[in-house]
Amino acid sequence: MHSTLHNQIAAAAKQTKADLVIQNGKIVNVFTREIIEGDLAIVEGMIVGIGRYEGEKTIDAEGRYICPGLIDGHVHIESSMVPPSEFARVVLPHGVTTVIADPHEIANVAGVCGIQFMLDEAKRTPLDVYMMLPSCVPAASFERAGAVLSAAELAPFFNDERVLGLAEVMDYPSLREQHPSMLDKLALAANANRLIDGHLAGLDADAVNVYRSARIHTDHECVTPDEALERVRRGMYVLIRQGSVAKDLKKLLPAIHEHNARRFLFCTDDKHLDDLWFEGSVDHNVRLAIQAGLDPLLAIQMATLNAAECYRLPTKGAVAPGYDADFLFVDDLETLNITHVFKAGRLVAQHGQTVFPAERSAESLEQPLLHSIRCQAVDETDLRIPMKRGTKAHVIEIIPNHLHTNHLITDVDVQEGAFCPSIERDLLKLVVVERHRGLGIGLGIVRGFGFKAGAIASSIAHDSHHIIAAGTNDRDLTAAIEQLRQQHGGLAVIKDGAVLASLPLEIGGLMTRKDYTEVLSGLKQIDKALKAIGANGSFNPFITLSFLALPVIPELKLTDQGLFDVNKWEFIPVEAV
């Protein structure tokens, strides 16, 4: 440490040459939101000066802008379907040099083993992966996940410097009623002087007071400007989300003004690999914000300095002395065209491709991570939804590109005393199969997929990650579920009993050890198959499907135990009285 500090101070004082000097660049100063000029001197991965410097090596920025590396403030890496080592190869070319990850997807399947897997995998990449420990495994007290994590099981992870705090507290009833297990986790984080993230989906100002009283300081679930302002006024940071399903950015931008802008940052939350590759990570958030009229320097500040300060990362988020040499070369601030990405002063990506060798995931994985689909085969008779008193039913209505759903009560087709899917009315059967211990099957009705044939199934079903399937007929539904059993999880599209496309995800039914290029190819085949059964392409059916089982986001969801009214916080029958 002393030798590093000595070398850095000596170079800053121009007593010795810097390791690297970046010349002819326009530095984006996120403290003052201005462009400044000068050489950038770097020693042992840290910026030591801006001015006139000599270096052992020089790089000509050729007049480009030099921006801080971008920070994704909240992401579930598992949603990319690849582990951190491959995830990094996709997001680094997009200028993302730091992420704040919540590994609660794999934790819901494999418990502490899943968290440790993600921490170990994160060491295989130059990307800085910080973790927030899952606070709600399972997501709600009645959920039957693959694990239940207590404060005692989480405590040892706080010894890892990459663990910044407690991840999104989404079980509001347990928080409001001061459930002992919830208080234990909050106290664990507070006593360790760590941060606590929130999850205030659909909650009002009174609930914000409850969250703030619990020392919870962020929310990424705002969908209206009023919600965002309620949180900021009470001292929270608001993460503006733009993911594969939840696309809240344009709606929230009106909440930002000169006096409150430092309380906003960006996140992706959940984003599929193909969306990350072709569209981008939080660089996409920045571009959208600029296109919508936000000052480019403010948008960059939100994606860098604001995020670093929110998560107490004092050496991240700026191009300035004393900060890590994580920076980007950008051709144009309006389009944020990123040409080069540097991590700790080393080039890691250039013109959309990484320039460091890939490191494969560990070949040997612990048993809880493999063969995690443990349910029995499902028969068509298991999928019968009785309708004994008429044709009225409670129906989940999808809102395209939103996590929320509508709760409908509508007429459905009934044959021989049971619900019959209707392609004409876009009323399909929805199935959730408990996959960790084979405990049961939940059945419901969903509107909005628009399929004309077939069925789809996935072992990605937030947050307990049971098998979830939607389809036009029972034959294809059972075939889709069986395909996932055989391939140990993943995605499948079925038509007329045949597999049109599938993507095995052998790590907990959530991720694969395959190269990201193979996953992109597999997702392309999935998209082709979805079109063959009638998907119109206006939203991602699989990501939408994956959130239909999450009973902490309103209004109506389906779990393995049945239909759940989130607003009333109770299970209800499918048939409406």
Curated annotation (Swiss-Prot):
Belongs to the metallo-dependent hydrolases superfamily. Adenine deaminase family. It is an enzyme of class 3 (hydrolase). Keywords: Hydrolase, Manganese. The gene is ade. GO terms for molecular function: adenine deaminase activity. It comes from Geobacillus kaustophilus (strain HTA426). This is Adenine deaminase. Its EC number is 3.5.4.2. GO terms for biological process: adenine catabolic process. It comes from the Bacteria. The keyword Cytoplasm does not apply. It holds the Pfam family Amidohydro_1. HAMAP family: Adenine_deamin. It catalyses: adenine + H2O + H(+) = hypoxanthine + NH4(+). NCBIfam families: ade. The lineage of its organism: Bacteria, Bacillati, Bacillota, Bacilli, Bacillales. Its cofactor is Mn(2+). The keyword Membrane does not apply. InterPro entries: Adenine_deam, Adenine_deam_C, Amidohydro-rel, Metal-dep_hydrolase_composite, Metal_Hydrolase.
